[in-house]
Amino acid sequence: MYEDGLSFLEEERDAFRPFEALLELTDEQLEQPLDGAHGWTGRDLMAHLGVWIERWLEVAKELAVNPQSPAFDELMALEKDWAAKGDELNAQYQAEWASLPMAEVRRRFSTWPGELRGYLTVVPETRWLKESGHLKSLLGNTTEHYADHEPELRAILAASGR
């Protein structure tokens, strides 16, 4: 799919860029629930994407120094049970992020994607780009996941007049 890691990193960067518009919204705009976004707020969308970026950031940190990643194994266990527990987990993650100060939500959302890209530059490509299970999970938690949530992003931005 990708000839080199840089190709993925550029695609991921481009795919995430539209979501950075959430950082330009006021705290009040980020807290406004919307029907067109499954009742989510901008904060909820930031949390939802952030959780999975964070999980892959942990995987990348481990893969940078070892060929195996316990964090990846945990992620695979979550994905295996997703059909049964996905809504429950999403609600849990949403509640965890709702308890954070908005400044922390913004910090995580603005820094973790870049940190993930940075770590992936030092992970040997054989451990993520050329390893089909890792690549499939990475895509599912980044570029494909972003695409899945573009409708919510559009609704949130439209409600804020953007």
Where are the language model's segments positioned?
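Short, contiguous alpha-helical
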Residues: E31-A84, G118-R162
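Short amphipathic alpha-helical segments at helix-loop
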Residues: M1-D4, A37, Q94-P101, K130-H134
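Hydrophobic packing residues in well-ordered alpha-helices of helical domains and bundles
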Residues: G5-E12, G42, M102-F109, L135, ...
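Terminal low-complexity, poorly structured segments
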Residues: G5, P18-A21, K85, W112, ...
